[in-house]
Amino acid sequence: MSINFVYINSVTQELTTLTEKLDVSSPSECNDTIKEIRELWEKSIPLFSLSVSFREIDYLGETLLALSAACENRDEVEFERYRALLIDALDGVSRLEQFSIVNIL
């Protein structure tokens, strides 16, 4: 089992947990949590880039920026949209890193 596999799945799980706990109705808490997510994400990019495509990395970063803007603007509809997209993208990265017959072929 690859160390990068373990690292990526651990970080995506932590990012997903933080993203799920975001609450747009509490702007200061939302901004603090997004800052925590962003710091973890930026710290993780070098190891992610060893096996995750730059397209996926860029998409995660862009979605996080959009989520941050929705939080700042208290736009609940956009906030929920980008939160769902970020969680789905994190799940996709995690799935791509799993060992399976589909990924091997």
Model-predicted segments: where are they?
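Structured, soluble extracytoplasmic/luminal domains of envelope-associated proteins
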Residues: 55-105
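Hydrophobic side-chain positions on well-ordered alpha-helices
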Residues: 21-25, 70
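Alpha-helical transmembrane signal-anchor/signal-peptide segments
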Residues: 4-22
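Extracytoplasmic/periplasmic/luminal assembly and interaction segments
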Residues: 30-73
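TPR-repeat structural position
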Residues: 27-28, 76
